Amino acid sequence: MTEQENAIAVSHLAKSFGATQAVRDASFEVRFGDIFGLLGPNGAGKTTIIRMILDIFKPDRGSISVLGGAMTEQKKDLIGYLPEERGLYKDISVERCVLYLAELKGVPHNEAKTRAAQYFDQLDLTAHKRKKVQDLSKGMQQKVQIITTLIHRPKLLIIDEPFSGLDPVNTRLIQDVLLQERDRGTAIIMSTHQMYQVEEMCNRIVLIDKGESVLYGTVDDIRRQYADNAVRVVAQGELPQIEGVRETSRKGNAHVLHLTEQVSTQALLRQLSEAPELHIESFALALPTMDDIFVRVVGETRPTAKGTD
C-alpha cells in the first residue's frame, strides 16, 4: 500500500526520556476507513507513540508519515484528538463550548451550529445544550468531548479510551457515531483497554509491549492465529462421549470441546452428526477472545522493568 493510501505510516519508532526507553521499535500502518486498535498494557508506550504522531514529541529514531507526509500546521486542522486527560471549558454552556472549539478548527459559525445541532440530537444532548459544561454528569461531558473532537470533520481521528464513564446506552450511541465516521472514510486510531470493544469495532490492531510492536494484523487473523484445536457446538440434547476430546466446558446449550491433535474438527462433526437424539444448531471453531490473547502475549514477557506510557 502506498503512502498516499495510508493515513498513518509508522516505521521503527524509538524514543527515550533520559535513561528510560519509552518506545523501542514500533511499526504499523493505519488506512483510511480503518478503526485501528492501538493496544498495550499500562506503561507500554502507547501515549508516547500518539504524541510522536501528533508531533508533540520528536522520535529519536524511525519515521512517521501523517496524511501523506510530514506533519504540518495545516494538517493539524485535519486531525481530531481525544486525549485520556479530558479538557473542556467548564464555565460556559455546552453549545458555546462546542461552537468555540469548532471555529478554532476553521469551521464557519453557521456550519458549526448546523453540525452541533445534528450531534446534539444524535447523542441526546439537545435538552442540555444551554447548561454549563460543569453541571453535566461525567458521561454527558464525555459525549460533549466526542462532539468537539469530530465537529470539524477530521480525516484522522485519534481517541484514547472513548467509552470511559459511559453507560451501555451511551456507549452504543458513541459506537454508532464512530462507525459513521469510519464509513465516511475517516482513519480512526482507538486506544483502549476494553478488549470487547476491540472485537466489536476494530478491523486491525497493533499490540505494543515494552515499547515494541509484538502483535499486528487484522482482528480476525489474530484470533485464528491463537485459536486452540477447539470447537464451539450449540446443540439440543446430550453430547456423547467422544474419544479425543481432552476438555469440555458448557454454558447453556453451548459446548466448547478442546480436542487432541489426533482428532480433526471434520471427524468430530461426523461423530456428532451420527449421535442419536442430538440436534446440532451450530458448529464452529472456538476462537479466543482478544482479552485472552492480550493476557497470553503480554504475560509471556513478564516480569520485566516497566516502560513509560
Features from the language model and the residues they span:
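ABC transporter nucleotide-binding domains
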Residues: 5-8, 15-209, 215
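ABC transporter nucleotide-binding domain
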Residues: 175-260
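ABC-family P-loop ATPase nucleotide-binding domain
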Residues: 1-14, 300-309
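Short, charged/small-residue-rich alpha-helical element at the C-terminal edge
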Residues: 228-300
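Residues at or immediately preceding the N-termini of alpha-helices
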Residues: 72, 109, 219, 262-265
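Structural motif detector for alpha-helix initiation sites
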Residues: 32, 94, 219, 287-290
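Active-site phosphate/pyrophosphate- and oxyanion-stabilizing loops and adjacent acidic/basic residues
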Residues: 99, 196, 220, 270, ...
